[in-house]
Regions:
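Bacterial Sec-dependent N-terminal signal peptides
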Residues: 1-21
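Glycine/tyrosine- and acidic-biased, solvent-exposed loop/turn segments at the edges of beta-strands
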Residues: 14-256
Length: 256
């Protein structure tokens, strides 16, 4: 009889084992260790709360159990250090948040760990000089942002390091003279933009420096008299290529 009572008491005691995670205090604030899970039961995130605020290191996972990101919530501040990962475990991006908005310098990497872009943010908006890189590490492109708008000099480079293109932005629009170069350094194209539209004369050159064709534009439209001339691909050469960053975004590494 005593043995039965002891077993019953032991089982009852185990059933009343105090909860050690996902706690909420009398004021409704989350406290201590927390673990969140996906519907399939796999771990989604884990970390600490203090008075309802995330503190210290938090880890986030995909539904397949792979590490997705790490956040370091600095105690008693509005700053958070962040690091995101590719599915292969390589770092995809890293930087800092202030009040849950990107702030300061951010770095983005490809799946092999090569740096593909360096960006600067102010209160969640691109600000200052932004750089992108070729896979060989050389500078591919750089331009300047002012509170989320492109403003100032824009340049693009071949993977050899020589200049490929140069133009100027004003209030987020291409404005004024633009020039493209062949890989041998000779001028490939010279023209003008007005409020992000081709306007005026665009001169194309062969690699030996000889003029290939001259085309005239009026507020983005090719002059009727020039439509019968040699066909030149109608591309927005000046638009900065954001393919690599877009790939990063499409993989799901969005802000928390």
């Amino acid at each position: 009889m005593l043995a039965v009572l002891l077993c019953f008491g032991l089982s009852f005691g185990l059933g009343l084992r105090p909860q050690t995670s996902n706690l909420v205090d009398s004021k409704g604030k989350k406290q201590g260790p927390w673990v969140l899970r996906f519907e399939n039961g796999s771990k989604k995130s884990e970390g600490l709360f203090k008075d309802g605020r995330q503190v210290g290191r938090w880890v986030y996972f995909t539904e397949q159990g792979k590490l997705k990101s790490e956040m370091e919530f600095l105690v008693d501040t509005s700053f958070t250090n962040a690091k995101f990962y590719h599915p292969n475990g390589k770092v995809a991006g890293e930087g800092m948040y202030k009040n849950k908005k990107r702030h300061g310098r951010w770095f983005f990497y490809d799946t092999d760990g090569n740096l593909i872009s360096e960006e600067r943010y102010l209160k969640g908006l691109l600000n200052d000089t932004i750089k992108q890189f070729h896979f060989n590490g050389k500078l591919y492109e750089k331009w300047v942002y002012n509170q989320g708008l492109r403003e100032g000099l824009w340049e693009q480079y071949f993977d050899s390091g020589t200049l490929k293109a140069r133009g100027v932005y004003k209030n987020n629009n291409m404005q004024g003279h633009i020039a493209f170069f062949h890989s041998n350094g000779r001028l490939a194209l010279s023209g003008f933009y007005e409020n992000d539209l081709r306007h005026g004369t665009f001169t194309y050159y062969h690699e030996d420096g000889k003029v290939r064709v001259v085309l005239r534009y009026i507020h983005g439209e090719l002059h009727p008299a020039d439509r019968s001339k040699v066909q030149i691909p109608e591309t927005k050469e000046y638009v900065p290529e954001e393919y690599l960053k877009e790939q990063f975004r499409q993989k799901g590494y969005s802000d928390y």
